[in-house]
Amino acid sequence: MAGHSKWANIQHRKGRQDAKRGKIFTRLIKEITVAAKMGGADLGSNPRLRLAVDKAKAESMPKDNIENAIKRGAGLLDGVDYIECRYEGYGIGGAAVMVDCLTDNKTRTVADVRHAFSKFGGNMGTDGCVAFQFTHCGYLVFAPGTDEDALMEAALESGADDVVSNDDGSIEVITDPNSFSDIKDALEAKGFKAEMGEVTMRAQNETELSGDDAVRMQKLLDALEDLDDVQEVYTSAVLDA
């Protein structure tokens, strides 16, 4: 059992994502473009692209936008050449933070990320300072009340790596990142629809924060997520609302 406030954190994050829907299309188009550039335009052989396209469809992105982003990545249309970069650091209470960016100007991006860390009580570190604390994996979260035994059986039969039950009743299914979409589809076919699912960097150990520390940490995370060049923010912090 783990994470008494995990479900509250998940719900807050979903609320944050809904509140910034205006930026979601921009970020997804960047991700689709880079995924197609790195792994080709075939969804069947490019798990990263398939995942990005699935996210775009879930957000009701128009088909033309998706297809044009793929074409730009594959070099069939002109477009901005984005660079992938990752910055690492520490938040309140020493909580680990990783920030993934796609940018056409690394000088601007690193300055913006460093400023956000400094302004909101964090500390930007060196490459590799916290990356070892995270595992690259697929991550599905199911609501409290889900039949744990049935979900566990279905998940393991589908090839999941692990199933974790939380104190609040929510259940997490952990997968290999390249198998995420297939396992998600297999579970949905068996009647299990996740409240949230993504390929992510999952903290191996959590840093629980409460009270003023939790408020300050949320401000730091919000500031980082609001930066135009930021795609994802990962943290070991679990905030007690």
Swiss-Prot record:
InterPro entries: Integrase-like_N, TACO1_YebC-like_2nd/3rd_dom, TACO1_YebC_N, Transcrip_reg_TACO1-like, Transcrip_reg_TACO1-like_dom3, YebC-like
Annotated organism of origin: Laribacter hongkongensis (strain HLHK9)
Similarity remark: Belongs to the TACO1 family.
Localization, UniProt: Cytoplasm
First-listed, main subcellular location of the protein, grouped into a coarse class: cytoplasm
GO BP annotations, alphabetical order: regulation of DNA-templated transcription
MF terms (GO), sorted A to Z: DNA binding
Taxonomic superkingdom: Bacteria
UniProt keywords, alphabetically: Cytoplasm, DNA-binding, Transcription, Transcription regulation
Signal peptide residues on this chain, from the entry's feature table: none
GO cellular component annotations of the record: cytosol
NCBIfam families tied to this protein: PRK00110.1, PRK12378.1, YebC/PmpR family DNA-binding transcriptional regulator
Protein's recorded name: Probable transcriptional regulatory protein LHK_02347
Coiled coil: none
